[in-house]
From Swiss-Prot:
Mg(2+) 1 binds at E415, E422. This is Lysine--tRNA ligase. It comes from the Bacteria. Mg(2+) 2 binds at E422. Binds 3 Mg(2+) ions per subunit. It comes from Enterobacter sp. (strain 638). Its EC number is 6.1.1.6. Homodimer. The lineage of its organism: Bacteria, Pseudomonadati, Pseudomonadota, Gammaproteobacteria, Enterobacterales.
Length: 505
């Protein structure tokens, strides 16, 4: 047996012994009749205490005679004979407890407290004071075990090191990792900030179906499910777009939705099959209005949540305070592949030759517009580090966007990039029902030719357009990728509480 195998065996034995001991302690608690009491109430969290009292001297605290009640998980304990120091962790952070045998009811310190384990959840009451080192602490006069933890916490010095374990057992990651807790607090603040921003601009939040008879609103492979009562195959939605635009037809002129989308595709540092999007639709507006809205949204969120418009990410600093870069797709190709002749992008054969020269395998179903888009993604996308809007997307890859009035081969559409990643997609909406029907048919033809991400023909949506969709602009922003940027996270699984994982066999 190798040394590493021996260490692994020892670790299993130690864990089994620990589990056995903790279960025996719980059995003893059950005999006492109250293993999981539910009558303790706290009046402060740790962050509230630090905010209100960290600046005060010990003499001030003694004069104030502040009595508090707190509850949380015991993370550390230093027993020094008749007295101990405990670190208690709650939703707001950590607070130190000073526990003295002589200040607790008889028998509590030796017969109960000393037998409790790290990870147990405690309730404590006492008076605030500061130690000689100036640390705000609670001098306990009451201490109770509220929940017995049957499993030990991750090693206090190394935390939860295995990345996969962090995702599978997110609860342990949140207990032991301050940065992980901070990430998900920021995520919550971003969601709340978006809602505040949108409502402030007179948008109404709505909910649309998660299961759809016809998946639409994006080019992606859907998940299929079956509705037993209707005996009908249905699809988890890939986007809410077509339902949201039906609402604009119905007279709700500014709507938005924050919810999940599902796409039956690969998993990567940027992709999770189940992800969160914010989509909005605004009547009597065009894509240029949404470029302004997007800039304002990101600038506002950064300032309100992070306190600055300069957001660090790896070796870069994204500056949301400056005007965002704006390039057409062709300008971006030329900028990052200077040898490209712009005229060559207008011709199928020459565009195909460029694509193949840079390693792109051109599919038979692709037209010239799709090829140009693939060239852009290959040569330019990774270089779009600072906030950048790319405009003038080909109509071929924009089946729901309005054609440009001057050049019908392109659309009034933009995609928004930061850090070399697409964060958002917006455009002036196609409201010509006949044009939309033809583009749906083109998508059906592409699907028949082998494109399994092409859209279905949605006759009901075309019928809605025939009743009249006012001039409208729409925008979708990936919340997960936005959170990655604001938290300096480099994989999407770090910003999704429970990312998709293969089951452990």
């Amino acid at each position: 047996m190798s040394e590493q195998q021996a260490q692994g065996t020892d670790a299993v034995v130690d864990l089994n012994n620990e589990l056995k001991t903790r279960r025996e302690k719980l059995a003893a608690l059950r005999e006492q009749g109250i293993p999981f009491p539910n009558d303790f109430r706290r009046d402060h969290t740790s962050d509230q205490l630090h905010a209100d009292f960290d600046a005060k001297e010990n003499e001030e605290l003694e004069a104030l005679n502040v009595e508090v009640s707190v509850a949380g998980r015991m993370m550390t304990r230093r027993i020094m004979g008749k007295a101990s120091f405990v670190t208690l962790q709650d939703v707001g952070g950590r607070i130190q407890l000073y526990v003295s045998r002589d200040d607790l009811p008889e028998g509590i310190y030796n017969e109960q407290f000393k037998k409790w384990d790290l990870g147990d959840i405690l309730g404590a009451k006492g008076k605030l004071f500061k130690t000689k080192t100036g640390e705000l602490s609670i001098h306990c006069t009451e201490l109770r075990l509220l929940t017995k933890a049957l499993r030990p916490l991750p090693d206090k010095f190394h935390g939860l090191q295995d990345q996969e374990a962090r995702y599978r057992q997110r609860y342990l990651d949140l207990i032991s990792n301050d940065e992980s807790r901070k990430t998900f607090k920021i995520r919550s603040q971003i969601m709340a900030g978006i809602r505040q921003f949108m409502v402030g601009r007179d948008f109404m939040e709505v909910e649309t179906p998660m299961m759809q008879v016809i998946p639409g609103g994006a080019s992606a492979r859907p998940f299929v499910t079956h509705h037993n009562a209707l005996d009908l195959d249905m699809y988890l939605r890939i986007a809410p777009e077509l339902y949201l635009k039906r609402l604009v037809v119905g007279g709700f002129e500014r709507v938005f939705e924050i919810n999940r989308n599902f796409r039956n595709e690969g998993i990567s540092v940027r992709h999770n099959p189940e992800f969160t999007m914010m989509e909005l639709y605004m009547a009597y507006a065009d894509y240029k209005d949404l470029i302004e809205l997007t800039e304002s949204l990101f600038r506002t969120l950064a300032q309100n949540i992070l306190g600055t418009t300069e957001v660090p990410y790896g070796d870069e600093v994204f500056d949301f305070g400056k005007p965002f870069v704006k390039l057409t797709m062709r300008e971006a190709i030329k900028k990052y592949r200077p040898e490209t002749e712009m005229a060559d992008l207008d011709n199928y054969d020459s565009a195909k030759a460029i694509a193949e020269s840079i390693g792109i395998k051109v599919e038979k179903s692709w037209g010239q517009g799709r090829i140009v888009t693939e060239i852009f993604e290959e040569v330019a996308e990774a270089h779009l580090i600072q906030p950048t809007f790319i405009t003038e997307y080909p109509a071929e890859v924009s089946p729901l966007a309005r054609r440009n009035d001057e050049n019908p081969e392109i659309t009034d559409r933009f995609e928004f990039f930061i850090g070399g990643r697409e964060i958002g997609n917006g455009f002036s909406e196609l409201n010509d029902a006949q044009d939309q029907a033809q583009r749906f048919q083109d998508q059906v033809d592409a699907k028949a030719a082998g494109d399994d991400e092409a859209m279905f023909f949605d006759e009901d949506y075309v019928t809605a357009l025939e009743h009249g969709l006012p001039p409208t602009a729409g925008l979708g922003i990936g919340i997960d990728r936005m959170v990655m940027l604001f938290t300096n996270s480099h994989t999407i699984r770090d910003v999704i509480l429970f990312p998709a994982m293969r089951p452990v066999k």
